[in-house]
Amino acid sequence: MTEMKILIVTLTYIEKSIIDEIVNNLSSYGLEVDILFDSRKYLPISAFNWERLQYDAEKVLSFLKSKYDFNYDSIIFLADSDGYIDGYNFVFGLTIDNFAIIFLNRLREEFYNRKPDLELFMKRVVKEVTHEAGHILGLGHCNTIGCVMNFSNTVEDVDKKQARFCKNCIYKIENLSKYLQRK
């Protein structure tokens, strides 16, 4: 589909099975994926909103962009935190330019006072990482039922979609890739 090198940076412990699923899913689209386990990095306290008890996603991403300078087309961060942007109660993830962050807290069943479910958590993480990778590839939100690029307002919305791009989104990615190769 497109030749792109993506670095996934885990800012928290993530089960290897989840990382493997992320790599397999993104690799199936021809993306080259590397993993960096970097629990030494922290989210900046200056980005934490004490009234909301959440991180300002834009401030966090700006901070992380300044700390990582690798030879990758894109970097996606995974943080075991809760994030928001102005105008929204929360976000599962945010992409700015070629950088994205996924906030994992609300993808866990425990957040909703339910029994932990590692398999369901893994599916949700893979979907949200793929969704943010889609934004990095130039896609907006999609209205095709089940497409990973559907906007998710709730965790139930995440559960309804697949971890795959629909045919229309794949077509858009392929055409954008061809256009960029001609430039």
UniProtKB/Swiss-Prot annotation:
Residues that coordinate or bind Zn(2+) 1: H131, H135, H141
As recorded in UniProt, its EC number(s) are 3.4.-.-
Q: Identify the Gene3D superfamilies for this entry.
A: Collagenase (Catalytic Domain)
Residues noted as binding Zn(2+) 2 in the record, renumbered to the chain: C142, C147, C166, C169
Query: Its GO biological process terms?
Result: proteolysis
Its source organism is: Saccharolobus islandicus (strain Y.N.15.51 / Yellowstone #2)
Residues annotated as catalytic: E132 (proton acceptor)
Instruction: Cite the cofactor comment.
Output: Binds 2 Zn(2+) ions per subunit. One is catalytic, whereas the other seems to have a structural role.
Output this protein's name.
Archaemetzincin
| InterPro entries documented for this protein | MetalloPept_cat_dom_sf (IPR024079), Pept_M54_archaemetzincn (IPR012962), Pept_M54_archaemetzncn_arc/bac (IPR012091)
